[in-house]
C-alpha cells in the first residue's frame, strides 16, 4: 500500500505548549487552492466573505460567508476557488490534547474518540443550522481573546473551544465515524496518483493498492456536490 504520509500535514501550529493558531486566508489572492490533505489536529474553516469550494471527505460544498467547516483529525479536506469568486476565511487550528489530558472524563468520552475517528462531528455548520449562533459566538470570543492576549487568555480560548465542541456534539446525532473504509480508500488512491502522476495509472493498480476488487473501487462513492437548499 502506498505511503500516505505525504498527504498528512505535519506543520506545528502555535507554540508547542499552546498548540492553537488562527490564519486569515484569501483564495485566490494568497493561493489558488489548498490541496487534498489531512492532519492530526483539528482544523476549522470559518468563511468570512465571498464563496468558494470546500471538500470534506467524499463531499464537496459551495462555501458561503458564515459557513464553518469542521475537519476532525484524519479527515481528508481541500479548498479551491469557485470560478470568478473570492473567498476570505480564517483557518483555526488546534490540537485536541490542548483541551484535556489522560484520566479526564471529557478526554475519554469525546476527545480521544474524536482523535481516533470513532466520533464524528458535522462537517459543515451553516447559519440556519441548530446551534449555529452558540458555536459561532464561541469562535468570535476565541478570536478576540487570541487578539488581545491578556493574562489568562489561554484559559479563555480553551474554554471557548470546549464550548464549541459541545455545540457540535449536541447536534451530531448518529453520525457515521469520521474515518470510513471509503475515505481510507480515497486516501490511498490520492496518494497513488501523487506518486505516479507522470505515468500510466489503471483502475486495477489502484484497486490492488486498496486491497479490493476493481469493481468495488469503481462503484465506491465519489465526491459529490451538496448544494444549499
Where are these regions (language model features)?
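A hydrophobic/aromatic-rich effector-binding and dimerization subdomain
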Residues: 2-25, 76, 80-144
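Conserved short histidine dyad/triad with adjacent acidic residue
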Residues: 22-38
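Tight coil/turn sites that cap or link beta-strands
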Residues: 30-31, 66, 74
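Short, conserved beta-strand element in jelly-roll/cupin
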Residues: 37-53
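Short acidic-glycine-tyrosine-enriched beta hairpin
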Residues: 58-70
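Short hydrophobic/aromatic patch on the recognition helix
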Residues: 66, 216-218
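Short, Lys/Arg-enriched, Trp-marked, Pro/Gly-tolerant hinge/linker segments that flank
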Residues: 121-132, 146-210, 224
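Conserved small/polar residues in nucleotide/adenosyl-binding loops
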Residues: 218-225
Amino acid at each position: 500500500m502506498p505511503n500516505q504520509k505525504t498527504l498528512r500535514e505535519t506543520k506545528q501550529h502555535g507554540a508547542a505548549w499552546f498548540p492553537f493558531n488562527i490564519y486569515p486566508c484569501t483564495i485566490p489572492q494568497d493561493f489558488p487552492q489548498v490541496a487534498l490533505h489531512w492532519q492530526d489536529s483539528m482544523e476549522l474553516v470559518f468563511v468570512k466573505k465571498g464563496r468558494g469550494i470546500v471538500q470534506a471527505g467524499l463531499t464537496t460544498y459551495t462555501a458561503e460567508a458564515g459557513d464553518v467547516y469542521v475537519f476532525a483529525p484524519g479527515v481528508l479536506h481541500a479548498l479551491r476557488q469557485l470560478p470568478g469568486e473570492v473567498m476570505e476565511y480564517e483557518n483555526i487550528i488546534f490540537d485536541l490534547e490542548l483541551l484535556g489530558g489522560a484520566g479526564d472524563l471529557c478526554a475519554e468520552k469525546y476527545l480521544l474518540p474524536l482523535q481516533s475517528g470513532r466520533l464524528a462531528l458535522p462537517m459543515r455548520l451553516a447559519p440556519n443550522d441548530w446551534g449555529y449562533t452558540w458555536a459561532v459566538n464561541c469562535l468570535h470570543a476565541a478570536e478576540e481573546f487570541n487578539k488581545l492576549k491578556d493574562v489568562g487568555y489561554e484559559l479563555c480560548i480553551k474554554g471557548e473551544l470546549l464550548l464549541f465542541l459541545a455545540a457540535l456534539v449536541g447536534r451530531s446525532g448518529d453520525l457515521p465515524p469520521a474515518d470510513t473504509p471509503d475515505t481510507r480508500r480515497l486516501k490511498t488512491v490520492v496518494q497513488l496518483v501523487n506518486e505516479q502522476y507522470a505515468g500510466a495509472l489503471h483502475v486495477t493498480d489502484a484497486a490492488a493498492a486498496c486491497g479490493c476488487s476493481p469493481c468495488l473501487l469503481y462503484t465506491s462513492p465519489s465526491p459529490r456536490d451538496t448544494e444549499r437548499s
